[in-house]
Curated annotation (Swiss-Prot):
Pathway, per record: Nitrogen metabolism; nitric oxide reduction
One GO CC term, this protein: cytoplasm
Function: Anaerobic nitric oxide reductase; uses NADH to detoxify nitric oxide (NO), protecting several 4Fe-4S NO-sensitive enzymes. Has at least 2 reductase partners, only one of which (NorW, flavorubredoxin reductase) has been identified. NO probably binds to the di-iron center; electrons enter from the NorW at rubredoxin and are transferred sequentially to the FMN center and the di-iron center. Also able to function as an aerobic oxygen reductase.
Residues annotated for FMN binding in this entry: 260-264, 342-369
Binding site for Fe cation 2: D83, D166, H227
Coiled coil: none
A molecular function GO annotation: iron ion binding
Entry protein name: Anaerobic nitric oxide reductase flavorubredoxin
Compartment list: Cytoplasm
Amino acid sequence: MSIVVKNNIHWVGQRDWEVRDFHGTEYKTLRGSSYNSYLIREEKNVLIDTVDHKFSREFVQNLRNEIDLADIDYIVINHAEEDHAGALTELMAQIPDTPIYCTANAIDSINGHHHHPEWNFNVVKTGDTLDIGNGKQLIFVETPMLHWPDSMMTYLTGDAVLFSNDAFGQHYCDEHLFNDEVDQTELFEQCQRYYANILTPFSRLVTPKITEILGFNLPVDMIATSHGVVWRDNPTQIVELYLKWAADYQEDRITIFYDTMSNNTRMMADAIAQGIAETDPRVAVKIFNVARSDKNEILTNVFRSKGVLVGTSTMNNVMMPKIAGLVEEMTGLRFRNKRASAFGSHGWSGGAVDRLSTRLQDAGFEMSLSLKAKWRPDQDALELCREHGREIARQWALAPLPQSTVNTVVKEETSATTKSDLGPRMQCSVCQWIYDPAKGEPMQDVAPGTPWSEVPDNFLCPECSLGKDVFDELASEAK
């Protein structure tokens, strides 16, 4: 099935509702994706890109229903990755002499995937044009490392459509093709997720390349991406967002993520978050357990944040494997203008937190002091964690803190959360995890200061996932 994009331009791509992993398992496509291919019918017929290789036969069959394959005059490959040019082998088997227009680097990539050096390659550079009749031309713009060396964009004069390749796209599948037809909140989230996880390493290239394209002084009525929606309603809105995101982007937000073996590091994370919120209630704080969270959501939140706190238990004197892997990914993403602090618990011997601090510094973060706890933190240790959070809030504040929070918030919370007001702490009889009403359970939206009697019935123990019925009053507090 084809969709009219504009005039003689048709979408002939493929929706992929089921895909959940991209780039191996490095990117979770929780809302599917699409592989956008475009057929332009003027005096010359042009195909821009193909689809993912797993849809090769289906793509060629559908394309046959649109046009006699022998009538395709030119093929333009903006990017040689398999989700763009994957169907080339199947297509070229039918029309082996059709000229392929691409960058010089793309020839190496295409041959590396398809192994057909005999194909009719035509190298294009920035500013080169191709006349397709009816007074229209294709103008080519090289965009190396956005996000492969072979990448380029193609602009169609007359219709003023920019075929933008991966830039301005998103892994987002919907029966509707255009940006004004889909849920705007979902669309924004997927655009930001895509930029944060794929294009962040190349942010330094984004602004000059966009400036170069704008320097052509060409009107842009539509931006036709390689994945997700076609931007037809105010298409330059996504360009403005890219310029914003490329400028060492940060919000007044702190992300905390951790891994834990015995819940000790998790207790530290909660206490640190409480300290931050006490001192700077303006800052948004998000906590993630890496073992139970979507990795790409964590990285998107790091991208949005002014700083990140990373926690790990110590195992064999080093950090937990999932933390090590995620820090390695952050190193590759090359975040800028962000601060970091490491924390974690250990038993008879430490090592993980120091190692983690070094890795975060190597990843380009401006480091603050780290925090360690031995074994399960007691109330004194948790107060140190809260104080660490308060100090982080002060150090990382983007504006002067409200004086009331600096002077009185700790005293006010102490008086408001006495045991007589909130009732006893409760202990899970299975795993021994303790619910403290003064701290609540932020991961399940149970606010600090919530007595056990007011905790929702669907509450689950964060450690063993059993319900409220397995909890007993803590023995030391039972009367």
